[in-house]
């Protein structure tokens, strides 16, 4: 857990610092084509994959909740994450799908905000567990606990921040 602490502190600090900005980042693009949305999703996924772990923030009534995660997958042109249906995070996301993810890689960090949607089909569960085989000891595509969620297209803003370059803002 000690390795998570510096990332968590940086993510929380950047969230507090940059969420107060009232002017948009200079390169805040609108999605103009499906290809641009696909590229933004791929770049976001690759950042999460390279970072190895990220922090998922949800809302529990009036209290924010943050915890480390490590699953990410692009399946059927959507960015997915995975959790256990019996966990508090699942209950929170079913009540309010709005979430934020933060991860750090080198001297950059990414913040992803959007709406997560539950997908109870077997196919994305199989794909997620195949991509993350270490989870197969705890989860199965056929159990009643495995939960996969995807970011609802059109709701996602993904921003790569650094102290050495301007923010890179992507939407998909």
Segments (PLM) and residue ranges:
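Charged, gly/pro-rich active-site loop segments
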Residues: 22-36, 111-172
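C-terminal motif of bacterial Sec signal peptides marking the signal peptidase cleavage site
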Residues: 18-19
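Short beta-strand segments
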Residues: 51-85, 93, 99-103, 111-113
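Short, basic/aromatic recognition patches
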Residues: 33, 37-49
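Short, intrinsically disordered, mixed-charge
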Residues: 94-99, 130-134
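Charged, amphipathic alpha-helical segments
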Residues: 39-41, 83, 89, 132-134
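Bacterial N-terminal signal peptides that target proteins for export
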Residues: 1-8
